[in-house]
Curated annotation (Swiss-Prot):
Name this polypeptide is given: Oxygen-dependent coproporphyrinogen-III oxidase
Chemical reaction(s) catalysed: coproporphyrinogen III + O2 + 2 H(+) = protoporphyrinogen IX + 2 CO2 + 2 H2O
Organism: Cronobacter sakazakii (strain ATCC BAA-894) (Enterobacter sakazakii)
Subunit: Homodimer.
Functional note: Involved in the heme biosynthesis. Catalyzes the aerobic oxidative decarboxylation of propionate groups of rings A and B of coproporphyrinogen-III to yield the vinyl groups in protoporphyrinogen-IX.
Gene3D superfamilies to which the protein is assigned, alphabetical: Coproporphyrinogen III oxidase, aerobic
Pathway the protein takes part in: Porphyrin-containing compound metabolism; protoporphyrin-IX biosynthesis; protoporphyrinogen-IX from coproporphyrinogen-III (O2 route): step 1/1
Keywords from the named record: Cytoplasm, Heme biosynthesis, Metal-binding, Oxidoreductase, Porphyrin biosynthesis
Binding site for a divalent metal cation: H96, H106, H145, H175
Entry annotated with the keyword Metal-binding: yes
Annotated substrate binding sites: S92, N108, V109, R110, G258, G259, R260
Cofactor: a divalent metal cation
Places the protein is found: Cytoplasm
E.C. no: 1.3.3.3
Length: 301
């Protein structure tokens, strides 16, 4: 079946609406929308909730851009795409909570299609979600990964382990030799067995994000915290910034295609700190993050 771009776009717009509505319901504050146009073609809706009770900053972005030539970041691992026009659309979000006991979360679902006259279109889906705790809780990690495993199950027994590994490998800071968080799912270049199956999987990932995240937020948002926890949260947020600016393909793609910089960098935490040579105290809750949660684990054995 030929790709149905309008069906994908309708799902993505609705997904953005639903995620914003549910995050607003948890926080009590509203998102502010910024509709924008891209000079080279296309545009989007950026929505940001700032200075909320639960969420210090949450950004949920929809974009649909098109152009006459694929950018270098997209053709580097797919050289056959050079010389094709393209359309790219997706929803991308990052939630930075206020309480250090609530983890940061990120999710993204996207669709690419590249075409040229006289040739079949090249298309694929990508996306996933991942969790970045500051203070780890076993039950939260298990719930997050169980939700991921269960949404993958209808698509095959090998889907969850494959996309979990891809997530573990992708969200890794090589210069720190350290995982960004506890992972989740990551997939890209998905175009088999057919459009409908791939689209259904992308929908399952998009719909599964809140099922994975909101129960964790509800469990942790009222835990008391102080300056020590806040300092560690801000320090660990530095890893988020490092990953996004140094390693993230989506950030590079957006900047190379002349994307909207404010929307691309919406994922950045509002406050962050670095500390030279930081080492957590032995046997502290901070040390437990490095010892028990950042190393790759099978959470749903």
């Amino acid at each position: 079946m030929a790709p149905d771009i309008q069906r994908v776009k309708a799902f993505l717009l609705d997904l953005q609406d639903r995620i914003c509505q549910q995050l607003s319901a948890v926080d009590g504050d509203d998102f502010v929308e910024d509709a924008w146009q891209r000079e080279g073609g296309g545009g989007g809706r950026s929505r940001v909730l700032r200075d909320g009770v639960v969420f210090e900053q949450a950004g949920v972005n929809f974009s649909h851009v098109h152009g006459d030539a694929m950018p270098a970041s997209a053709t580097a691992h797919r050289p056959e795409l050079a010389g094709r026009s393209f359309e790219a659309m997706g929803v991308s979000l990052v939630v930075h909570p206020r309480n250090p006991y609530v983890p940061t979360s990120h999710a993204n679902v996207r669709f690419f299609i590249a075409e040229k006259p006289g040739a079949d279109p090249v298309w694929w889906f990508g996306g996933g979600f991942d969790l970045t705790p500051f203070y780890g809780f076993e039950e939260d990690a298990v719930h997050w990964h169980r939700t991921a495993r269960d949404l993958c199950a209808p698509f095959g027994d090998d889907v969850y382990p494959r996309y979990k590994k891809w997530c573990d490998d992708y969200f890794y800071l090589k210069h720190r030799q350290e995982a960004r968080g506890i992972g989740g799912l990551f997939f890209d270049d998905l175009n088999t067995p057919d459009f409908d199956t791939c689209f259904a999987f992308m929908q399952a990932v998009g719909d599964g994000y809140l099922n994975a995240y909101l129960p964790i937020v509800e469990r942790r948002k009222t835990l008391p915290w102080g300056e020590r926890e806040r300092e560690f949260q801000l320090y660990r947020r530095g890893r988020y910034v490092e990953f996004n600016l140094v390693w993230d393909r989506g950030t590079l793609f957006g900047l190379q295609t002349g994307g909207r910089t404010e929307s691309i960098l919406m994922s950045m935490p509002p406050l962050v700190r670095w500390e030279y040579g930081y080492q957590p105290e032995e046997n502290s809750p901070e040390a437990a993050l490095y010892r028990d949660f950042l190393p790759v684990r099978d959470w749903v054995k």
